[in-house]
C-alpha cells in the first residue's frame, strides 16, 4: 500500500505518495497535471512494477502553500527535492499534462540522473493560458471533484501568473533520452503539427495516440498508460518487463 511521505524544499513542505518496494535500480518519479493530486494514482501505482512516487508540488494536495515560489524554475526545484528524497541515483521521469514543464525543467539541469522520460498528453514547453482560462479551469471539476478541493486557488493563480512561455524542444532533443509520448484523441494539447514535430525531433521515440481518451488519458482504461510506461522503463533499463 502506498504511503504519504514529506520532504522539504527551502522551507516548503512537499508531499509525495510512495509505493515503496524494489526500485530495480531506478525508481519512477511521476509529476502529474495542474489539477491532479497524488491520491488520484494510488490504485495504479503497483502496476508500474517498481517503486514509484507521485509528486505534489507546492500549492497542491497536502503540500505547503507558501506566499511565493510559483515560477517554473522553483516548481522544477520542488520536483528535484522529491527526487533527492527518494534516491541519490537515476530515475525514470513520467509526466502528465502541465507537470511536464516542471519535470523537464529539472531534467535539463540534471541530465545524468534521468534514465528515461514518458510524457502524457503534453509538449516540452511551459505554456501560457489565454486570459480567463485559469479561473475557468479552477472553478471547474476534475475527476468528479471541485478543482478548488485539489489545489489552493491563490497558489494556482500565482502559478499561472508567474508562468513564462518557454520551449524545451531543442534542449530535450539533445539529451537523446529514451522517450515515450502518449496523446489523447482530443488533439488539443498536442496538435497534429506538434505530433509531427515530435516525430522530427525525436525519431527514436515511441509515439502513441489514445484515440478514445479525452485529455485525461487515464480514461477509459486507468492502466493502459501505466503499462506502456512499465514496458518503456524496463526497455530503457535493458531488461524484460
Please place each PLM-identified region on the residue numbering:
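N-terminal cap/lid segment of alpha/beta-hydrolase-fold proteins
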Residues: 1-13
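Conserved HGGG/HGGXW glycine-rich cap/lid loop of the alpha/beta-hydrolase fold
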Residues: 12-64
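Conserved alpha/beta-hydrolase "nucleophile elbow" surrounding the catalytic nucleophile
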Residues: 32, 95-100
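Active-site loop/oxyanion-hole signature of alpha/beta-hydrolase fold enzymes
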Residues: 39-46, 54-94, 227
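Flexible "cap/lid" loop of the alpha/beta hydrolase fold
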Residues: 101-109, 115-143
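The alpha/beta-hydrolase serine catalytic core
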Residues: 127, 132-174
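Conserved serine/cysteine hydrolase catalytic core
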Residues: 158-201, 206-209, 217-218, 222
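Catalytic active-site module of serine/aspartate enzymes centered on a nucleophile-bearing elbow/loop
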Residues: 205-241
